[in-house]
Amino acid sequence: MKKFLILLAVTLLPLAGFAQASSGKVSKRKVASVISQYKNKAGVDVVDLGWLGTSLLKGLVRYSDADDEDTRQALMMMKGLKGISLMSYDESDPSLKARITSHLEKALKGAELLMEVKDEGDKVRIYGTSDEKSGKVRDVAVFAPSDGTFIFLSGSFNLEDISKIMDK
């Protein structure tokens, strides 16, 4: 399911350009605070890649097959990526899961909702800050409370580069 959510986030980024004028942005500080508060709790798994980690990830992608057109386009999309945070808390006890969900909802309150997907009662919400003038979306958060999954992509992403990948 986590792979699906990551793929969904990257797939749906082009649709952010259709969002209304920005009502608010995702607060990196609030998101980091929630992740920091719960990262050492039982049943909570956190992966945090900062600037250096994402640079290494880009290097691995570049090294894997630089002659491949898809790889080059993925690198173009990733050039604005500054950090990735993933928190999975689906295996935590129910009361902790409810607290984490509540804190994440509070941290995302007022942020621009780019998209909400409902599937068999499960919701996946994608937040971010879109700028129609520059054709970019910044600081994207993917939140699936029923699955206990939260993904935060820090950086600025060009919608045109993402659209090229999606057209294939």
Where are these regions (language model features)?
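Bacterial Sec-dependent N-terminal signal peptides
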Residues: 1-24
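A generic beta-sheet turn/junction motif
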Residues: 12, 119, 144-146
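Early exported N-terminus immediately downstream of N-terminal targeting peptides
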Residues: 24-92, 97
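Extracytoplasmic
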Residues: 41-44, 79-81, 119-123, 135-137
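Short Gly/Thr-rich strand-loop-strand
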Residues: 101, 105-131
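A short, solvent-exposed beta-edge/loop patch
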Residues: 127-159
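A recognition module on extended beta-rich or small alphabeta surfaces enriched in W/G with H and D/E
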Residues: 159-168
